[in-house]
Amino acid sequence: MAVHNLKDLLAEGVSGRGVLVRSDLNVPLDSDGEQGRITDPGRITASVPTLSALVEAGAKVVVAAHLGRPKNGPDPALSLAPVAAALGEQLGRHVQLASDVVGTDALARAEGLTDGDVLLLENIRFDARETSKDDAERLALARQLAELVGPTGAFVSDGFGVVHRKQASVYDVATLLPHYAGTLVAEEIAVLEQLTGSTKRPYAVVLGGSKVSDKLGVIESLATKADSIVIGGGMCFTFLAAQGFSVGKSLLETEMVDTCRRLLDTYVDVLRLPVDIVAADRFAADAAPQTVPADAIPDDLMGLDIGPGSVKRFTALLSNAETIFWNGPMGVFEFPAFAAGTKGLAEAIAAATGKGAFSVVGGGDSAAAVRALGIPESGFSHISTGGGASLEYLEGKALPGIEVLGRPQPTGGAA
């Protein structure tokens, strides 16, 4: 699908024009104090190239973004104040923060912008219309967002982590303003097209995370494209149970056992399960780890990571791969005693990349794990900023925030 991109907008000229940018600044916070501390600024860093290009070209930049999932309107704990400060540091300039989304403060600040200024709106999800299922409500918010950049304004979609959402600042505003894919979104789509097009083989997929139900679509889609799919994380126990093995107190989706049995029967030559598990008697960082066979987890233990034998086996498989997609940790990597599986496979993927493989880390917890475990990001071909969006794309689903960018350009303005 052909879409207009940031280069097209810059070629048209943005000096003196208002440009609304939907960024993904949904970073994790460590709540040590009212404003919180950013523990992983990766998404902020990824948003900088598009914003810097617009600033340098003299645009009046208005940024919309969300943080967390506010339940009942504004929540001080989910204010974008720490994000504004961190973004300003990375851009090397002051970033204004509006105290509202499209209220009087946002309007006044937007009207007062000069060329090269950056205004960050307060958490877009503080306005319930952003995520409304009612088309009219979302469109009403989108019109107010468009008003912030005026009749000559433009919209740049650069929040790949939200393009699978049909939301006011992602989808509806693009129906009102001339729309362009930002640098990040364009790069993400190009990478995912490589995973679904003429992929170099062998093609290995590594899937972790807690629930089979979250990954069912991508397993079914990629099982016909990949040469092997490694299953780890909490969801591996439902697959082990489907083989008739005891999984002790491990996470188990009982309602998915039959589905896993069907997948194992259908894709017996593709799916790869752990041969051993690192287990403990409780879910805690100080729990004593025990390595047990994957087909005989004791009743009083729960699996919290894949074992060293599994890491060795999967490392050998990955060492021969030419293309690798990884989404989801292999265990509870936040607990050091149960991080070896995730770290081992991450290192194996990085080693394969060093030998010429094309590797993609599919965002979310996988990207956080890479950073938390101290593995250089340069060891991978691409680290995505959007876990859910990546998975839905690979499932073959339409992404509303991408689909709308392929539509004919409106004339601009909020009308």
Swiss-Prot record:
Disulfide bonds: none annotated. It is an enzyme of class 2 (transferase). Keywords: ATP-binding, Cytoplasm, Glycolysis, Kinase, Nucleotide-binding, Transferase. Pfam families: PGK. Substrate binds at D24, L25, N26, R43, H66, L67, G68, R69, R125, R165. It is found in: Cytoplasm. ATP binds at K215, G303, E334, G363, G364, D365, S366. GO terms for cellular component: cytosol. It catalyses: (2R)-3-phosphoglycerate + ATP = (2R)-3-phospho-glyceroyl phosphate + ADP. SUPFAM superfamilies: Phosphoglycerate kinase (SSF53748). Monomer. HAMAP family: Phosphoglyc_kinase. Belongs to the phosphoglycerate kinase family. PANTHER family: PHOSPHOGLYCERATE KINASE (PTHR11406), PHOSPHOGLYCERATE KINASE 1, CHLOROPLASTIC-RELATED (PTHR11406:SF23). This is Phosphoglycerate kinase.
